[in-house]
Amino acid sequence: KPSRIEFSARTKQLFDTLRDDGKPAIIFASHLGNWEIPALGAVAHGLDCAILFRRPNSEAADRAIERTRAIKMGTLVPAGREAPLKLGEALQRGQHVAMLVDQYMGNGVEVTFFGRKTKANPTLARLLRQVECPVHGVRIIRLPNHRFRAELSEEVKPVRDAAGQIDIQGTMQAVTDVIEGWVREYPDQ
């Protein structure tokens, strides 16, 4: 029986490289399509991941969801004060860090999304300052007949300031631009 999730030869090549190169990487996603599929697929196919997640407000729901996710989603890192430290440690150990990056953050860095100013969570760019590593986006595109296409982006190069340091705002704008491109391409997702 064919899989309900398809991917291109290039996505498979990028994924295999990330899994087999022995280096850490940061993988970002947004709330498009079925955004939990990439974490499930990555772990199922051998990618060592630490995944940032936000706990539900209900403790009972949190316990049930965490039990399910822990079996299938690798190392789970709850959002909070300690999350950046834990994610940085995961990168230093050579793990891949995955996170959703498209939610408004009141004390975030200013980025432009569809011509409007908004605030992005700077954690991804700050982690790059600790451990320079490749950054890729991943998305799931809903297809007809309950099928999906997984796509891994080419590497998103961090923006650097005049001194060669990772530019937090510029890097988050580059990531936001990728997400804007995804929405423009498939606005119904």
Identify the meaning behind each predicted range.
Residues D16-D21, A44, D48, R81-Q189:
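Non-catalytic C-terminal accessory region of glycerolipid acyltransferases
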Residues S8-T11, W35-A39, S58-E59, Q95-A98, ...:
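Short hydrophobic/aromatic-rich motifs at helix boundaries and adjacent loops
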Residues P2-A25, G33:
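A short, well-structured juxtamembrane/interface segment
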Residues K1-P2, G80:
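General structural signal for secondary-structure boundaries
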Residues P2-I5, A29-S30, A50-I51, E89-L91:
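Short acidic/polar alpha-helix capping motifs at helix-coil junctions
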